[in-house]
């Protein structure tokens, strides 16, 4: 069930899963254009067509009564787990630097940077084959820590027009009260351009399917976006001392997300590769989402046997995975070799689901090789920065000649004269 292939084949398969069909992109553009043109009517029409929900009957914005009912439906144990996760996420993100600064030079010139939170953001939380209250916390809590004033959350409704109670409770626990029953490209367009019932946002963050990702790409420039996140993925680097059943379980934890998810073991130990493959087959039998996981592993899963851990690190860096587990004897000694990864998990007890739910860092991470240049969602995702320049007369005179020389070298006489006038 876990194909034994080489690194080149893994890279070929992983790149192929991210190629969007033009038909999907065209459909996304069609939906966005309709929402821009028709507003709320288009959102409601596509929700009926694609999700099978009549928002006129189900209600578009979640009410206080719905949130109250959700609390009554959630067990005390689950509520406690949500609150522990929320607090861990908040604690982690409060440690992230976000301060403004100013410095005064010897000539009196003041330079600085002013950091401010975005005024209004839209968060997308996926639905479909599973509900993700954890994604609510992983996006909303960092936004709250950053100081965002208004947060609008969009998530697709279930067939009966409701949202999962645990998702609603997670939103309430994160301080989000503006929740809309909409998903897909129509939700992204509504957040970006606004409708009669949704005020436009400054930025859209959160993971979604190919329609959501392409829609975010289309509206970028009208609003900012966090990243273009694709299917989930994990790379486990393990040596011969790793437990095959633990490695297999971690691979399956990502494979069960989506048929397009990628799960790869890289090891210098051929015996471990075989044992993990056998464990994957055994554990699949008891997995409720085994059909999804089986398709994922058949198409985008792999065990790759390499010559040593150095070669394993090279392959992992070229894949730039969303999640990278270092399940080796001395993981800290290999940390410095990691160049590209969204999140890094060190040692046998740092199982990937720890990051998905409770540790503290956001689980919204770069995928599809974009960890080469994207960073995880964080407080910084929800901040904007302004440069500050305050020059006095002495500082101006010291700089004036250089500015005029550079401006005239670029053929921008107006720039030079703006400086020259102040010297007179």
Curated annotation (Swiss-Prot):
List of residues binding substrate: 232, 254, 257, 323, 356, 410, 415
GO molecular function: histidinol dehydrogenase activity; NAD binding; zinc ion binding
Pathway: Amino-acid biosynthesis; L-histidine biosynthesis; L-histidine from 5-phospho-alpha-D-ribose 1-diphosphate: step 9/9
Free-text remark on how the cofactor is bound: Binds 1 zinc ion per subunit.
Domain of life the protein comes from: Bacteria
Keywords: Amino-acid biosynthesis, Histidine biosynthesis, Metal-binding, NAD, Oxidoreductase, Zinc
Cofactor(s) listed in the protein's UniProt record: Zn(2+)
InterPro entries: Ald_DH/histidinol_DH, Histidinol_DH_CS, Histidinol_DH_monofunct, Hstdl_DH
Enzyme class label: oxidoreductase
Residues noted as binding NAD(+) in the record, renumbered to the chain: 124, 186, 209
Catalytic activity, as annotated: L-histidinol + 2 NAD(+) + H2O = L-histidine + 2 NADH + 3 H(+)
SUPFAM superfamilies according to UniProt: ALDH-like
Residues of the active site: 322 (proton acceptor), 323 (proton acceptor)
Chain positions recorded as Zn(2+) binding sites: 254, 257, 356, 415
EC number(s) given by UniProt: 1.1.1.23
Biological process, per Gene Ontology: L-histidine biosynthetic process
Cross-referenced Pfam families: Histidinol_dh
Function: Catalyzes the sequential NAD-dependent oxidations of L-histidinol to L-histidinaldehyde and then to L-histidine.
Protein family (similarity comment): Belongs to the histidinol dehydrogenase family.
Record's protein name: Histidinol dehydrogenase
